[in-house]
Amino acid sequence: IVGINYKGTSSELKGCINDANNMYSLITNKFGFEDVKLLLEQDATTDNIKENLRWLVSGCRPGDTLLFHYSGHGSQIADTSDPDNEPDKLDEIICPIDLDWKEKVITDDYLKWVFDTVRAGVNLTVFLDSCHSGGALDQANQYQVVVATKGVDLPVSGGRYMAPPPDVQARI
């Protein structure tokens, strides 16, 4: 479970840590999950999130139930690894606290790579509470993707929106 408010930045959010804590409480107290990792604010670095995603799926067996919850900023960057796999040539990303728009990012390709290691018979539920979350698992081919979206359209700059790099902004 990841929650990042980006406190003290121009892109500060107000409820992501609260959402993550509520999810943690729900799944541990009501549903009895025991092996739960909670990454909040400064602990939600690129390396920590990636390490914990790999931990989540490692050793899972048929019948296991896995959950990944992310509440924070999402955005897009130019797809430099394989631009032809995305119609818009953009990768959706979740934005860790140490985001640098180049190497400290977590792309939809990375999420797909991790989640594609989940074996048949394992129930994986992913909550992405962020902008651009509807496309973050758009290449999923071995699992069912259900997208539920609710929100408001925000301008490219200002407010609590995390503006993507200029090369991506030019395409929006």
Located regions from the model:
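Structural beta-sheet core signal
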Residues: 1, 38, 126-128
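Cell-envelope and extracellular/periplasmic
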Residues: 1-9, 71
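Glycine- and acidic-residue-enriched helix-capping/strand-helix junction motifs
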Residues: 7-21, 25
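Signal peptide-proximal N-terminal region
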Residues: 22-35
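Short beta->alpha junction loops
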Residues: 37-46
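Caspase-like (clan CD) cysteine peptidase catalytic core
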Residues: 46-71, 75-142, 154-159, 163-164
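Intrinsic-disorder/coil detector with helix-boundary
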Residues: 133, 169-171
